Amino acid sequence: MRPLTMSGHFLLAPIPESSSDYLLPKDIKLAVLGASCVGKSAMIVRFLTKRFIGDYEPNTGKLYSRLVYVEGDQLSLQIQDTPGGIQAQDSLGQMVDSLSKCVQWAEGFLLVYSITDYESYQSIRPLYQHIRKVHPDGKAPVVIVGNKGDLLHARQVQTHEGLQLANELGSLFLEISTSENYEDVCDVFQHLCKEVSKLHSLSGERRRASIIPRPRSPNMQDLKRRFRQALSSKAKAASTLG
């Protein structure tokens, strides 16, 4: 399953040299979470370089940075890769030490499982619950990704199972093949960047609304002066009538 293709509006750009008149882009901070060997690092590298590399050393948690253009807006994208080792039976408490800092830092999340590994699918729910515990307002966007969609002969997780889980959690679901389709990978990151950017826009509008100056109230000296003027006017009117 895929959303509407958006890759044509998504460009990678080199980070420019610093300049005094260079306008800093918005920061977009994403985290890619999931069990071991589901293709998290491959997804990130595929997105950033368009190349697919199948074999990786065990990940120790790398941070990738790149300038991107989303529908004409320049964004400074940071993607945190995370170590695997998350199992379905892990409690939220067991995940705190290894993931809380990353989850607190990030603004949007990719939860990745492999369609060839049912246990990796079962780890998605506790990961999602941990995100919502750290971000209780429920605004941080989450996309659930079923990776390795080209390995149909080894499938253990059916498409409808991924869709059902995403519906229960209120998240977007996509089933992709990192190795075979760059556009699908790009669409995943594109969607998440747009959702985080929307949050930035909304929070910016709220901040601007909160600092709109209130009408200045007259101070006490002004009130006393007006009161004396009113009394004086009444006194003059009374003496005239008398």
UniProtKB/Swiss-Prot annotation:
It is an enzyme of class 3 (hydrolase). Keywords: GTP-binding, Hydrolase, Nucleotide-binding, Nucleus, Transcription, Transcription regulation. SMART domains: RAB, RAS, RHO. It catalyses: GTP + H2O = GDP + phosphate + H(+). Transmembrane segments: none annotated. It comes from the Eukaryota. It is found in: Nucleus, Nucleolus. One of its GO terms (molecular function) is G protein activity. GO terms for cellular component: nucleolus. Pfam families: Ras. GO terms for biological process: positive regulation of transcription by RNA polymerase I. Its EC number is 3.6.5.2. InterPro entries: P-loop_NTPase, Ras-related_GTPase, Small_GTP-bd, Small_GTPase. GTP binds at residues 34-41, 81-85, 147-150. Residues 17-241 are annotated as: Small GTPase-like. Regulator of rDNA transcription. Acts in cooperation UBF/UBTF and positively regulates RNA polymerase I transcription. Belongs to the small GTPase superfamily. Ras family. Interacts with UBF/UBTF. This is Ras-like protein family member 11A. It comes from Rattus norvegicus. The lineage of its organism: Eukaryota, Metazoa, Chordata, Craniata, Vertebrata.
